[in-house]
Regions:
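PLP-dependent aminotransferase-like
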Residues: 17-107, 111
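Short active-site oxyanion
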Residues: 2, 23-26, 219-220
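Conserved PLP-enzyme active-site core in the AAT-like
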Residues: 67-73, 90, 115, 126, ...
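Short loop-beta-helix segment that forms the pyridoxal 5′-phosphate
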Residues: 1-15, 29-31, 51
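Conserved active-site segment immediately N-terminal to the catalytic lysine
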Residues: 105-137, 142-144
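A generic structural signal for well-ordered alpha-helical segments
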Residues: 41, 96, 120-121, 237
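Active-site PLP-lysine loop of aminotransferase-like
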Residues: 83, 126-139, 153-167
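PLP-dependent aminotransferase class I/II
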Residues: 33, 78, 150-243
Length: 243
């Protein structure tokens, strides 16, 4: 089952409901993670138990997780594939099967990553991806479910208003025109009253504009372009002292 959303975190919200996670259920999450990545779990009333990751490899600390799985009685494990580099999904799948947990794969940066002929996210009970972070789209998130219960999972409500894309389009335009640093400086002088993550966020489908663009994209070419950009950046950073 695959569904398209406006944001990857909306896909995670949908997965929480589809997999039958309830308020009060415990989810093991990495201690190294952004607030927006786990916000849907908090919105659903789930209890988050952070686990350590190896600072060198960013792989989960499996011995610690084994202790936590016995003590906290969790329902699910969130596995993050950081920066497009995959964590070991085979180890995660085996761990979850051994302890009777659902496996949620955060593939926000791993949309175009494959291993052994399969895309990352194939091992989890649910995997969510960010389209707009890796492709030239105004919005877009993808949910892949191995099992969604009886019957087909209902798609999210469509968004058709152009106003829904306006903030993203303005931000992308500012970046293209070189105005992003000035905007950040202007925002820095305003008092911070809340995190960027809202108290709740209703799930909505990908915008039709983004969907039309997505259907026109050559994904293999986009993957190779991303890899070429990474190699170029890595080579240039290698020449910078202290990095």
């Amino acid at each position: 089952e695959r569904l398209l959303f406006a944001r990857a975190r909306m896909a995670l919200s949908w997965a929480v409901a589809a997999l039958g996670l309830w308020p009060g259920d415990v989810v093991l999450v990495p201690a190294y993670v952004t607030g927006s990545a786990v916000a849907p779990l908090l919105w659903a009333g789930l209890q988050l138990q952070p686990y350590a990751v190896n600072p060198a490899t960013l792989e989960p600390h499996w011995p610690m997780l084994s202790v936590m799985a016995r003590a906290a009685r969790p329902r699910a494990l969130l596995l993050v594939h950081y920066f497009g580099f995959p964590s070991d999904p085979n180890a995660a799948r085996a761990f979850c099967d051994r302890h009777g947990l659902l496996l949620l794969e955060d593939c926000a940066h791993s949309l175009l990553t494959r291993h052994g002929g399969h895309p990352w996210g194939s091992h989890g009970d649910a995997a969510f991806y960010s389209l707009r972070k890796l492709l030239p789209l105004p919005d877009g998130g993808l949910l892949r479910l191995r099992f969604a219960g009886p019957g087909r999972l209902l798609p999210p409500p469509l968004q058709t208003s152009a106003a829904a894309l306006l903030p993203l389009l303005l931000r992308q335009a500012a970046q293209a025109l070189g105005c992003r640093p000035a905007l950040r400086r202007a925002a820095a002088i305003r008092p911070v009253v809340a995190d960027e993550v809202r108290l709740s966020e209703p799930a909505r489908g990908i915008h039709p504009w983004s969907l039309r663009l997505l259907r026109r994209l050559a994904l293999p070419a986009a993957r190779e372009r991303r890899r070429a950009n990474y190699r170029e950046l890595s080579q240039r950073l290698a020449e910078v002292p202290g990095i």
